[in-house]
């Protein structure tokens, strides 16, 4: 049963500006594993990566119904890719999580659908 849906869209140029202080911003929103991947990227690919993770985490927090804040932080959520490149969202909550991330020249968008484990 679907228990939550969240979506977020972010302007890439907004993330690009925040990446000027690269490490501080990335430490605030990316887990250590995500930062390790990000440090290997440059230019527009880095911006897309960080924006996609930012949007995915915001979308998840909206699907849960809390937003980013006291109950859910950026560092409580990790986005990895499976062997085919599909993004997978990792959290400590007990939901089935469906995640989609997309980019254009100007935006990154992510959508999360949460299902309960019991059917």
From Swiss-Prot:
SUPFAM superfamilies assigned to the protein according to its UniProt record, in alphabetical order: 4'-phosphopantetheinyl transferase (SSF56214)
One of the GO BP terms on file: fatty acid biosynthetic process
Localization: Cytoplasm
Key words of the record: Cytoplasm, Fatty acid biosynthesis, Fatty acid metabolism, Lipid biosynthesis, Lipid metabolism, Magnesium, Metal-binding, Transferase
The reaction(s) this protein catalyses: apo-[ACP] + CoA = holo-[ACP] + adenosine 3',5'-bisphosphate + H(+)
Statement: the UniProt record of this protein carries the keyword Hydrolase: no
KW Cytoplasm (keyword) present: yes
Swiss-Prot/TrEMBL cofactor(s): Mg(2+)
Signal peptide bounds: none
Pfam families linked to this entry: ACPS (PF01648)
Similarity section: Belongs to the P-Pant transferase superfamily. AcpS family.
HAMAP family: AcpS
Functional description taken from the UniProt entry: Transfers the 4'-phosphopantetheine moiety from coenzyme A to a Ser of acyl-carrier-protein.
Protein name (Swiss-Prot/TrEMBL): Holo-[acyl-carrier-protein] synthase
Organism: Bacillus cereus (strain ATCC 14579 / DSM 31 / CCUG 7414 / JCM 2152 / NBRC 15305 / NCIMB 9373 / NCTC 2599 / NRRL B-3711)
